[in-house]
Structures are given as structure tokens and as C-alpha cells.
Curated annotation (Swiss-Prot):
Residues 131-142 have a biased composition (Basic and acidic residues). InterPro entries: Pept_S54_Rhomboid-like_Rom4/5, Peptidase_S54_rhomboid-like, Peptidase_S54_rhomboid_dom, Rhomboid-like_sf. The active site is at residues 409, 460. Residues 194-204 have a biased composition (Basic residues). It comes from Toxoplasma gondii. GO terms for cellular component: membrane. This is Rhomboid-like protease 4. Its EC number is 3.4.21.105. Keywords: Hydrolase, Membrane, Protease, Serine protease, Transmembrane, Transmembrane helix. It catalyses: Cleaves type-1 transmembrane domains using a catalytic dyad composed of serine and histidine that are contributed by different transmembrane domains. The keyword Membrane applies.
Amino acid sequence: MVWTSAVVMASPHGSASRAGSNRRTDGLSVNLGQDNTLKHDTPTETAPSASPPRVAPAPIPPKGGPAATPGKDGALDNRGSHDSVPPVAVAIPGREEVNATASQKSVVAGANSQPTPGTQSSKAPASDVDGSSKHGSPEHPDAGSPEVNAEGVPVEEALQAIGDDDPLIHNLPDGVVGRRAPANPFNSSMYAKLRGKKKKHRPKVRDPKLNNNPLRGRLVVCISTTALLCWIYMWELIYNFTSFNGRCVSPVMYPDYKLQEAKQRQPYVIRYGYGGCEYNLGSLAYPRASFGTSAGDKGWPVDLVPNGSAGSAATSWDSPNARVLRHLGGLETNYIREYSETFRLFTSMYMHGGWLHILINLSCQIQILWIIEPDWGFLRTTLLFFLGGISGNLLSAVADPCSITVGSSGSMYALLGALIPYCVEYWKSIPRPGCILVFMIVVIIGILTGMAGFTDNYAHMGGALGGILWGFASITTVSACDKCTLGERMAMTPPFSWCVPKATQQKLLERAKARKAEAIRRRKLQAIQKKKAGGARGKAMYAVKMRLQEEGRPPCKMSFREWVIRGLCAAALFAYWLILFLYLLDPSLYKSYSPPGQLKFSGWLYCKCGTIVYQAPQTYGNLGRFWCFGSEKDAQYYLEP
């Protein structure tokens, strides 16, 4: 077992003083509070002077000196001369022991520490905690002299000079600032009342104007996309009402084709009102509705249009008529290929097919953007939403060209997929990782339930893949997952914590704290090298680096590992887009393969593509075009001569 710290003192009478049993007396004791920052426990006896004179290192004891004996708590006891000053052996959890003999704080702490009853303070040099001799240690060949850095300053003194709030260590603002996490109903005050407990209130940041809080006021993408999606859906409903379910937008009146005189059969422009539409639709013009079952119709009157009933369309209780989706830019592969309407890849991701559709997408989208956007920023989140939606629509257009698709589900699943690189990037500071796991389960359930209904699974899978690739292509660091405490944090998050005993949770918490302390110390050692920059040029470079660091983001190592991950994921995303665009727009490619269609629990849905060869009045303007049909009857009618 490795102790947090140990100050070793010896008694000439042979009784060892306790080290590390009560309050630690060294300057590197670690205590992680609610703010997850490293705190120093300094003894009350230490002089408050900022820079007291240094104490010379103790002489090396002779080889024939007395051997070290363990104390009651495992600390080692040395006996030696009263004229020497004891160096301090410091042990950080999860790391090998480091000798700090020249640090002023540690020396004064060891010199001024009061001995326990029945013992006297010893000034003999202490040996390492593992009992090995300092003089012959292969790791410390010359332990009599302190370990120094390139500037000649002892390493332990340099470590203590760097505060835990130094921007080189982290750039979070002062106070308890936690990362946003999915809403956990098990942590709500209402659920706490049901269980007969009080909800623990976390201390808030003393920043009433929220100037320094990196997790507030950065929801531009969340607010703007939500408002845009709602506005476009309102426009769909208005257009469905004013266009008579998408059947009439022209003011031209077409008289009955059975009239005797040719002049009476001539069309006329009705300049005011809906006279032209009312005449063309006859009794089928009413009732008018923006959505619901009343928005369905039987097509056009058969007394004016012989095959008018072929254009009938039914609607559900929360949806507008499907005709308006095609008019307003829904995703339909046939129009992209034959009429060069590639804009449908973009416009369809902002349209929705019903109230339930948009409410589900917005509820999930707002929750994830509330988590991701404050850390990823405006540009990175905007590109995530856009690239994810296009990625989903590309896969849908190529794999299922026989149906029309609308909705921001591709972008929403891109946000869900982006939670994976987000967790890798910020794992150490995510408040409730268990809820993130629940979100991942929602993705799987959503895809599986989509196989039973009229949902576009290709848009969901393509969006999730695009979100994962873009997240890793733009990731700042992957070092947060080094020695990540996944099991420990999951075990202490409800509802998983209900199944773990309190004693086990405490052990897991201590293990996580040990890893945290080691990580902070390692980053401090790296910060020593960064602080060497001096002069005007060095200060300017330091200022630029600080401006490039976004608040709330962990230190970006910019190492070879990060660049490899970014490059591979960016190349994969580019190849994904390139292949799908070629199969969507290149006739030599999309005419040579058969699309699979949607996969459901009942099997693959019918989808067949080919060139229209049937000559009839109904095929005017379509003869010779390459078209995809979702109906076997229509495919046989138009694709066979």
C-alpha cells in the first residue's frame, strides 16, 4: 500500500512517531474537494514568510548507520545524529516515491512538527519509504543533493510554486463549475422527497453576471436551430392550407374538357381569390385544413380529370399532406438526379412530417446541444449539425431512392454520435456518465424501433456515423481517457450506486482521487517547462497560446496521437461523402447497382429503379428518364414496354 504522504521522524529512545495518521504535515498532501482541485495542507507551525532562507541539505549518513524500522502505520523510523536536518520522503498515490530534500516548506514542516507523546523530535536523515538506501538507489544516484530542473531550481520547489489554478494546469474559472450533463430524474428534488431524503445542493459560482462561467450563454446553435425548425414547420402548415393540400397553387381555371365549343374549353386566369382552384377542385376543394385527417383528400374530381383519383393522399392526425413535402424541398432522389435539385439534401433536414416528429427531434436535440455546445463552441457545433444532417441524407438518398424523406433526425443522431468523442475529450469532468450511457442506449433503441415503423433508418445511421467522424476529426485531445475512471464514476452515479455498497464506493472514490492527484502532478511537471519562456517574445507567445485555449477545455497536447486520430477520421469522413456523392450523381454508377431499400422487421421494402419505356399520355416528359419506384405495380407499369 502506498500512503498519501509521510514525514519521517525518529526518536533517540527508539519509538517511532506516527506519520500520516492524522493531519499530514508535508506540503504535497492532496485533498480533492467538491471543486476537484488539488489543495495543499500546510502546517500551522510553518512561518508565513513567502520566501524564507533555504535550509542546506542534510549530510549522507554512514553506511554503518542504524537500519530503518517500520512504525505503527507503516512509516519508517530512522535514528541518526541530532545535528542533521531530516529530508522529507513524499509519496503521491499511484506513483513512485519522490525525494524532496531541498524544498523549504517540507523542511520547515519536518523541523517544526511536534512529536507525539512519549517521543522526541529527531533530526536524523530519513530513508526512502520503501526502505532502500538513498545513496545507492539506481533511480536517485545522488540523493544527498536535491533534484533540480534546467534552471537549477529544485523540482519539488518548482512544483509548489505552480498553483493549482494556474492556466497551465487548467483554465477553468474560480468556483465550483461542473460540466453540463443530461437531466437525471434520480437526482431531482421531487424524487428525493419520495425517498425521504434531501437533495444535496451544490455551491454556486460567485459570478452573478456569468462573465467567467464557460458553461453559460453559449447556446446560439441550440436556440437558432430550434427556432428555425419551428418556423419552417409553421410554414409547412400554412402552405398546406393555402394550397388546398398541395393540389392547387395556380390562379388558372381549366374548364370542363367535355364542353362542345373549343372557346369554352380555353383556360382563364382568375386574378383575384381562389376562384381557379375552387373550380378545378370542385366539391373536393373543401374542407381545408393545415394538418390532421381533414388534410387528406381524394385527389382531383373525376368529372374534370379522368384519372384524378390516382392522386389521392391520406394523412395522419398530426401531419400535413405529403404533397407539400415534395413541393417545399423534401429529400427525393429522383428529383435530385433528373432535375439537378441537389439542394434537397440540405432543405429536407429542416422539414418535419408532423407534430410528434418535430417534438421528439427537438427534445433530444435541445438536450444534447445543451451539453455539447458550451464546450465545442459555435463553429464546431454548427458544422456538426450541418455535416451530420448531410451525411444522413446522403446515405438515405443512395440506399433508399424510392421514398421521400424529411426531418432533422440525421442531425439529431449526429449529435448523439458526437457524444462519443465528447466523452473521450471531457471524460474527467462529466458530472453524470451514467446518463451519457443511457443516451447511447437510446440510439440503439431508436434504430431498432425505427425498423418497425415508417422511419428512415439510413438517415439515422448515416447521421450518427457523420457525427462520430466529425467529432474525432475536430477533437482537441484524447488524453482525458488515459487512466479514465469509468468504473469508479459509474458506480457512484444513481441508479448504479444503489447496487454498490458504501464501503466499495469509498474505495473507488479513493482510487479515482489518486489518479487525479497523479494527473495534476504530471501536468505540473509539464508546466515547469512551459514557464521557461521569458522576455517580450516569450510573453507574446504565452499570450497567444492562452487565447487559443477555449475556456473549459482540457489542455490540448497537440501530440502525434491526436493528429493521427484527426487525420484518419477526417479522411474517413471525406471518403464517405465522396463515395455517396458519386453513387448519387454519376449515372454510370447509380444505374449499375440495385438499391436495397429500407430494412424492416418484416424484410426489405420494395424498391426498383430503371428507365421509363412505357409510352402513354401519363408519361409525358418522363419517357426515357431513370426513375425509382417504391410500388411494384408502378414499376411494372412504367419500366416494362
